[in-house]
Structures are given as C-alpha cells and as structure tokens.
Amino acid sequence: MIADVYIELKEGVADPEGEATLKALRLLGFKRVKKVSTVKVFRIDIEARSREEAEREIAEMCEKLLANPVIQKYSIVWRE
C-alpha cells in the first residue's frame, strides 16, 4: 500500500517560505496568485494487513516524527 502524507502548517501559523514565494511571483508579474502555502509530501510504501492498520501506523508516524502537532496538520491520501 502506498500513501502520500501531506504535512502543512495550521491556519494562523506564519509561513515565511510561502510568503516569500508569493512576493517573488508577484514581482515576476503573476498578479492573480492570491496565496502560496508550503506543503511537504512523504510517499510511504507500507505493508499491512488492512488499510485501517496502515492508516493507524502512518498516523502514529506523523504524530511522533513527521509533523509537529503544535503548528502542523497532516492528511493521508492513498494511491491506487
């Protein structure tokens, strides 16, 4: 089973990289861009007896290592 795990900042947390990218895009003439957010993606290939078991294990990975629960949130998208 393969999952894409998206790690992004929670609402209200400053995103200096996203803000700098937005500013640079506007300076390059891309005036219609409203917002740029930084998102990190981990592609995890995991062996498990069920999708539920794999999802529990990946959630534990996120809570223990991949995401900082104080300022980040995560979502899991399964690849078929």
UniProtKB/Swiss-Prot annotation:
Gene3D superfamilies: Phosphoribosylformylglycinamidine synthase subunit PurS
GO biological process terms on file: 'de novo' IMP biosynthetic process
Catalytic activity: N(2)-formyl-N(1)-(5-phospho-beta-D-ribosyl)glycinamide + L-glutamine + ATP + H2O = 2-formamido-N(1)-(5-O-phospho-beta-D-ribosyl)acetamidine + L-glutamate + ADP + phosphate + H(+)
Pathway involvement of the protein, from the record: Purine metabolism; IMP biosynthesis via de novo pathway; 5-amino-1-(5-phospho-D-ribosyl)imidazole from N(2)-formyl-N(1)-(5-phospho-D-ribosyl)glycinamide: step 1/2
UniProt-recorded Gene Ontology molecular function terms: ATP binding; phosphoribosylformylglycinamidine synthase activity
Keywords: ATP-binding, Cytoplasm, Ligase, Nucleotide-binding, Purine biosynthesis
UniProt KW GTP-binding keyword: no
Subunit (UniProt): Homodimer. Part of the FGAM synthase complex composed of 1 PurL, 1 PurQ and 2 PurS subunits.
Name of the protein in question: Phosphoribosylformylglycinamidine synthase subunit PurS
